[in-house]
Amino acid sequence: MDSRTGELLTYTQCQTGCYFDDIKNPIYFRLQNTTTMATGNKIITLQIRANHNLRKVLGLQICWLNLVVLSVSPRLSGEALLDRFKFHVMKHLNNLGVISINNVIRSINHFIDLFDQRVFYAPSFYYNIKMRLY
């Protein structure tokens, strides 16, 4: 859904993409927040942002995808999870060959499916996508 207008994204808007090799550093990853709970579990918030060149090709004004991860492992830090997450998402996008909104979401789901649910659990995924209106 477009967070500015409230309209649902169309199929063509979600499937529009560009080749992975055409854009240098198409997406970048940020560690938003790491919170340690009293039980030893960690809540880690990761953010994926589209680069300016990718946003221009896809016709986006803003594209932020946020993933909240609940880690049961006391050894898994936010930086370690961010490195693994970045590696696997970029590897999956490289294997697909095309970057689109749907392919990025598929890559995130692929990463979540790769790891055992006992290590971490992703309870929420939210986004901020705004299409260019002009």
From Swiss-Prot:
Chaperone in keyword set: no
Subunit structure: Homooligomer. Interacts with the replication-associated protein (REP). Interacts with host proliferating cell nuclear antigen (PCNA). Interacts with host retinoblastoma-related protein 1 (RBR1), and may thereby deregulate the host cell cycle. Oligomerization and interaction with PCNA are necessary for optimal replication enhancement.
Organism superkingdom: Viruses
Keyword Translocase among UniProt keywords: no
Function: Increases viral DNA accumulation. Enhances infectivity and symptom expression.
Family: Belongs to the geminiviridae replication enhancer protein family.
Keyword annotations of the record: Host-virus interaction
Intrachain S-S bonds: none
Protein name according to UniProt: Replication enhancer protein
Source organism: Tomato pseudo-curly top virus
GO biological process, one term: viral process
